[in-house]
C-alpha cells in the first residue's frame, strides 16, 4: 500500500519538568521506578494545553484538553489538503474507512475539568473527523499502546489488499499522561532494571498527533507491514524472517532506556525526536522527509514488552 498523504503536529508549548507530589503516592512511586529502569535523573513533558500560570508542580498534570482536540482537527485538515484536488475529491466519494488510534484507550479520566462531549471525543471517536472525511462505511478505534499505529496499518493493508476499501484514513495521537508514561516505560524496560545510562540525562515525552491516508494509488512512500516476530533475541535482521538485502536503514522505535550502545547503522527515533508513544514509529517518515532521502528502504522496528518485535518497511523514491 502507499502513503498518499500525512501530517504531524506537536505542541507549541515549551517543555516542563515533572515534579513528584506526596498527594499522589502511586504516581510518585511509578516515577521513581521509571527513572531507575530508564537510567535517567528527570523527566520533561511537552503537552498540548500546558498553562504557565498554574502552580509549577501541576503544569505537567493538568493541561487543557481542548488544544489537543483542536490539534487533531488541524492535522486532519493538513493531511487532506496536501492531496491534489482530484485525489481529495476521489477520497471523499470513494469507499473509505476511518481508524482512530491512541495509546491508552479510555484516558479521559486523567483530563482536568472535561465535558462529556470532549470526553467521548478523546475516549471513543472524534465525530467531526468522521464528517470531515465523509466516512459512511467502517469506523473503529484501536488502543494498542505503542503498537496502535502498527495494528491500524496492518488492518489498512488487509482492507486495501482485499479491495474492501479504496482509502483508509488513520488519525490519532499520543497523550503524555505522566502516570501512564511512567508505568509504560517501567514495563518495557523491566529486564534491564537498576542499570545506569551510558550518559545520564532526562527523559523526554512529547505529545504528537497525526493523520495518515493510505491507498493503492502510487505515491512517493510505499509501506509494507511485516508480521509480529515472537523471538527473545530482538534481532531485526533474522534471516528466517524475511529477506533484508534491500534494507538501507533501520529505525528503532523502542523504549527510552540507554543502558546499551545503539548500533551505528540504526536510527534511534526516541533519542532524535523524543518519545511519543504510538506516534513514535511514524517519525521514521519524518526522518525520510527531513533528510530528503531517495531510492531506498527504511525498516522501522517496534519492540514488544516481553520479547519479540513488529516492523514495517518504507520504500522511498
Kindly give the residue locations of the regions a language model identified.
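Short, Asp-centered acidic motifs that coordinate Mg2+ and/or phosphate
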Residues: 167
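Beta-rich nucleic-acid/ligand-interaction surfaces
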Residues: 149-150
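Conserved "HGTGT" condensation-loop signature of ketosynthase/thiolase-family condensing enzymes
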Residues: 1-146, 158-164, 174-177, 185-317
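Short-chain dehydrogenase/reductase
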Residues: 153
Amino acid at each position: 500500500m502507499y502513503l498518499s498523504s500525512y501530517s504531524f503536529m506537536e505542541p507549541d508549548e515549551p517543555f516542563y519538568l515533572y515534579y513528584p507530589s506526596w498527594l499522589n503516592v502511586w504516581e510518585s512511586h511509578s516515577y521513581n521506578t521509571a527513572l531507575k529502569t530508564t537510567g535517567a535523573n528527570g523527566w520533561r513533558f511537552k503537552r498540548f494545553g500546558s498553562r504557565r500560570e498554574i502552580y509549577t508542580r501541576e503544569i505537567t498534570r493538568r493541561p487543557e484538553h481542548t488544544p489537543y482536540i483542536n490539534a487533531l482537527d488541524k492535522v486532519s485538515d493538513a493531511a487532506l489538503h496536501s492531496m491534489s484536488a482530484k485525489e481529495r475529491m476521489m477520497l471523499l466519494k470513494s469507499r473509505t474507512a476511518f481508524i482512530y488510534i491512541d495509546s491508552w484507550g479510555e484516558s479521559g479520566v486523567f483530563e482536568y475539568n472535561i465535558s462529556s462531549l470532549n470526553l467521548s471525543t478523546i475516549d471513543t471517536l472524534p465525530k467531526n473527523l468522521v464528517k470531515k472525511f465523509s466516512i459512511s462505511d467502517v469506523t473503529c478505534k484501536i488502543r494498542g499502546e505503542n503498537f496502535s499505529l502498527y495494528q491500524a496499518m496492518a488492518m489498512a493493508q488487509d482492507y486495501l489488499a482485499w479491495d474492501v476499501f479504496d482509502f483508509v484514513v488513520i488519525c490519532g495521537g499520543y497523550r503524555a499522561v505522566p502516570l501512564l508514561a511512567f508505568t509504560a516505560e517501567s514495563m518495557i524496560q523491566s529486564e534491564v532494571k537498576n542499570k545506569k545510562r551510558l550518559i545520564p540525562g532526562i527523559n523526554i515525552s512529547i505529545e504528537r498527533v497525526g493523520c495518515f491516508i493510505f491507498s493503492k494509488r502510487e505515491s512517493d512512500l510505499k509501506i509494507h507491514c511485516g508480521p509480529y516476530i515472537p523471538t527473545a533475541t530482538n534481532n531485526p535482521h533474522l534471516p528466517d524472517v524475511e529477506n533484508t538485502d534491500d534494507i538501507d536503514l533501520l529505525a528503532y522505535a523502542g523504549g527510552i532506556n540507554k543502558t546499551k550502545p545503539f548500533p551505528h547503522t540504526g536510527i534511534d527515533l526516541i533519542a532524535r525526536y523524543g518519545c511519543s508513544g504510538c506516534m513514535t514509529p511514524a517519525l521514521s517518515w519524518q526522518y525520510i522527509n527531513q533528510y530528503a532521502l531517495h531510492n531506498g528502504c527504511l525498516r522501522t522496528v517496534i519492540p514488544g514488552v516481553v520479547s519479540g518485535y513488529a516492523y514495517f518497511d518504507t520504500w522511498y523514491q
